[in-house]
């Protein structure tokens, strides 16, 4: 049995009424996953010029971090705490994440850490040898998605096919003074090796006096526990409990994510197709949607009000391409 997670995400702004203008996307297929190209973090894609009141803050992960998967694994999930030096509240209006070594970078998630939780993050860093700390499934600071799944602590994310995301001028992600960020890197050394230094470029503007609506990321995880293939059912990891224990051994997971997903989503824990239905508890406008799976993924959809006259499919990926995971702006 292979235990994994499928994640859909929505960029949402609270409020009702007509759908505002989309996030302005500046996305391109930056580098194919596991390709032979290895651009440095300084080799950015062309960026959208700064708009009135905006400025850039650039953050880099520790220089030349070399992933060190545990024996029997090719995955290293590592979190790094970085300080953007915010002395006043700011709004994030764009994110550009540039992997330094895309041969080994599977995905990147940037999460905010409010000032009240920075000491917790620093303690996790200090308790783990070397740069950063092991963080499978989340940062380890505030649970999966930080605050909660409906309004997560995500600031931005990158997976193969993603690029710079510049938001519509009427929205922004709030960051309070003293906020720091955690950059979670998922490294996979199956088809490559070497070191990595990645870059996160935040597009910021002052929050004071701004009329922008707060933008949040809603996480839509679903369980993916694939049955072992015919002819391979004798593996010890075809036992669900053994597979989950293996994940905890390799990545130090302290939260039973797999079991929590089944409480959230219900259904048979093992199957080729999985789904999860979530309730929306307040008015919101969906600005963009994205789906993330691993290489065994075949298709992914996100439906709103399924089975009702108002039903609408907001994400439809009939043939999933691991190298094309950029978010889709909605109209």
Model-found features: residue ranges?
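Beta-strand-centric surfaces of beta-sandwich/beta-rich domains
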Residues: 27-331
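Sec-dependent N-terminal signal peptides
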Residues: 1-7
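Bacterial signal peptide processing site
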Residues: 15-18
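C-terminal motif of bacterial Sec signal peptides marking the signal peptidase cleavage site
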Residues: 10-13
């Amino acid at each position: 049995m292979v235990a994994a997670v499928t994640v859909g995400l929505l960029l949402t702004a609270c409020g009702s009424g007509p759908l505002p203008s989309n996030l302005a996307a500046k996305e391109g297929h930056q580098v194919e996953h596991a390709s032979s190209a290895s651009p440095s973090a300084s080799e950015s894609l062309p960026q959208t010029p700064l708009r009135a009141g905006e400025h850039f803050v650039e953050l880099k992960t520790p220089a030349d971090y070399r992933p060190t998967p545990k024996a029997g694994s090719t995955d290293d999930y590592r979190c790094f705490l970085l300080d953007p030096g915010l002395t006043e509240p700011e709004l994030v209006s764009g994110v550009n994440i540039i992997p330094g070594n895309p041969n080994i970078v599977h995905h990147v998630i940037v999460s905010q850490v409010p000032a009240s939780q920075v000491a917790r993050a620093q303690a996790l860093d200090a308790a783990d040898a070397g740069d950063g700390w092991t963080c499978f499934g989340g940062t380890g600071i505030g649970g999966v998605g930080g605050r909660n799944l409906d309004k997560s602590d995500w600031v931005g994310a990158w997976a193969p096919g993603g690029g710079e995301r510049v938001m519509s001028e009427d929205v922004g992600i709030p960051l309070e003074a003293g906020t720091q960020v955690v950059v979670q890197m998922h490294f996979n050394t199956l088809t490559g090796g070497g070191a990595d230094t990645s870059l996160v470029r935040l597009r910021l503007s002052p929050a004071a006096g701004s009329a922008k609506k707060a933008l949040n990321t809603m996480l839509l995880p679903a369980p993916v526990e694939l049955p072992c293939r015919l002819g391979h059912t004798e593996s010890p990891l075809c036992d669900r409990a053994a597979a989950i224990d293996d994940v905890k051994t390799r990545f130090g997971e302290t939260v039973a994510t797999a079991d929590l997903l089944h409480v959230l989503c219900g259904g048979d824990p093992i199957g080729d197709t999985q789904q999860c239905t979530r309730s929306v508890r307040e008015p919101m406008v969906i600005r963009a949607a994205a789906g993330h799976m691993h290489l065994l993924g075949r298709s992914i959809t996100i439906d709103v009000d399924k089975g009702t006259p108002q039903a609408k499919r907001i994400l439809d990926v009939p043939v999933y391409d691991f190298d094309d995971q950029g978010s889709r702006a909605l109209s």
